[in-house]
Curated annotation (Swiss-Prot):
Pfam families: YgbB
PROSITE patterns in the record: ISPF (PS01350)
Name listed for the protein in its UniProt record: 2-C-methyl-D-erythritol 2,4-cyclodiphosphate synthase
Cofactor note: Binds 1 divalent metal cation per subunit.
Enzyme Commission no: 4.6.1.12
Residues involved in a divalent metal cation binding: D17, H19, H57
GO molecular function annotation: 2-C-methyl-D-erythritol 2,4-cyclodiphosphate synthase activity; metal ion binding
Naturally occurring in which organism (per UniProt): Ehrlichia canis (strain Jake)
Length: 173
């Protein structure tokens, strides 16, 4: 295989994650889910091996993909008890560190949370600030938005939550 003489200046990665909600109804004032690092009250819990943060999982996957380091499942497999109930912050920081080891920094990221409930947009700015602080970049370089599936499919039936992320990594000078 022919090697590049120079590393590419820009690399793009795409990430995706989905988790189902459990089937138990909880008191939403005492129950929360974590999305993009922010706790949001919700009447269902996420079923996951780690903390189930679909936003941070998708972003982690996008960063790892951009710099050619595989996927979140390869680095933090849900078959390994080491990652049971792990905070997704750790996954994201590790992905950022891997990008830096390869000579890249995260330029910007766009994350979309897909669900009928809970409502994400009231928390989007806090999510952006949380992620930016975690990976040490300007808040203007992180975007979090939300959409629904217009009540179609398992997400439309409120059976789960999903996220997609795209990230641009740039070669460090």
């Amino acid at each position: 295989m022919k090697q590049h003489i120079n590393k590419p200046t820009f690399k793009v990665g795409i990430g995706y994650d989905v988790h189902k909600f459990d089937n138990i109804e909880y008191d939403a004032t005492n129950t929360f889910i974590t999305i993009c690092g922010i706790k949001i009250n919700h009447h269902k819990k996420i079923v996951a091996h780690s903390d189930g943060d679909v936003g941070l999982h998708a972003l982690t996957d996008a960063i790892l993909g951009a710099v050619g380091c595989g996927s979140i499942g390869q680095h933090f497999p849900n078959t390994d008890n080491k990652w049971k109930d792990a905070k997704s912050d750790y996954f994201l920081i590790e992905a950022k560190n891997k990008a830096q080891e390869k000579g890249y920094y995260i330029s910007n990221a766009d994350i979309i949370i897909i669900c009928e409930q809970p409502k994400i947009m009231p928390h989007a700015l806090k999510m952006q600030e949380y992620i930016a602080n975690l990976i040490k970049i300007d808040t203007s370089c992180i975007n979090v938005k939300a959409t629904t599936t217009e009540k179609l499919g398992f997400l439309g039936r409120k059976e789960g939550i999903a996220a997609q992320a795209i990230v641009l990594c740039c070669l460090q000078n």
